Regions:
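SAM-dependent methyltransferases
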Residues: 154-228
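Conserved small/polar residues in nucleotide/adenosyl-binding loops
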Residues: 230-236
Length: 236
């Protein structure tokens, strides 16, 4: 962790000033951020490491998701620059930044919490952090869908029973049930993700259930695609 204030060149250790053009809030200086990033780059070079991938955490950045976490996990080093106040002088972002990232459509008082979110989501993908690689491959967003519901003991809790299929020991049926639950949960809660998943899996054969019909594939404009993204009736 590097304190930007340590790189200021004024006696007051001031890191911000009023924005050109007027407006509320204060804007972080370019100079201390630039000098801090140069120091980080020099440190990496001295260690024989590649230049860090520089990410500025701003509300105006591109939305953060699991795909981006996997991309960042592939870099040798990543530097996260936390925004604050009204923002950061755009010139230092243009000069040093590889990208700007936002963790959601809301505003925080600073980028520190956002940096922790990014760091945690990236570090957990590193070898040895989780006991098994499968530990994150079955989770929400890994394959573009939300994760299926989870259950543990007791079998019945306050009159609510675990779905019978999970007690059968039939791994094929369990996988089919979980896949259907994952698709249905995504369709209901995140139709944007569901539509994207259907577009990327146009030939996916969905299992038939005891009640209702599964999504069928039809030929339309010489492309196979789902008839619709309507409700999938699931087994109990």
């Amino acid at each position: 962790c590097h304190q930007i204030r340590d790189y200021t060149k004024n006696k007051q250790k001031q890191t911000d000033d009023y924005p050109y053009g007027g407006g509320c809030g204060m804007v972080l200086y370019a100079q201390p951020i630039a000098d801090c990033l140069r120091a980080v780059q020099a440190q990496c070079a001295a260690q024989g490491r590649a230049r860090p991938h520089v990410v500025f955490l701003t509300a105006a950045g591109r939305p953060y998701n699991e795909e981006k976490a996997r991309e960042l996990a592939g870099y040798d080093a990543v530097t996260l620059v936390c925004g604050h106040y009204e923002g950061i002088d755009q010139r230092v972002i243009d000069a040093f930044g590889d990208e700007e990232i936002s963790i959601g459509d809301y505003v925080l008082t600073g980028g520190e919490l956002a940096s922790l979110v990014v760091a945690d989501s990236v570090l957990r993908l590193q070898p040895g952090v989780l006991a098994e690689e499968k530990g994150y491959q079955d989770e929400s967003y890994w394959d573009g869908l939300l994760e299926y519901p989870q259950f543990t003991r007791p079998e019945v809790w306050e009159g609510r029973a675990v779905p019978p299929v999970l007690l059968t020991g039939d791994h094929k049926k369990i996988d089919e049930w979980r896949g259907a639950q994952s698709r249905e949960r995504t369709r209901e809660r995140r139709p944007d993700l569901y539509d994207a998943w259907c577009e990327s899996h146009p030939l996916t054969e969905l299992p038939k259930w005891k009640r209702g019909e599964n999504m069928r594939l039809v030929k339309n404009d010489e492309q196979l695609k789902p008839v619709s993204y309507t409700h999938l009736t699931l087994p109990t």
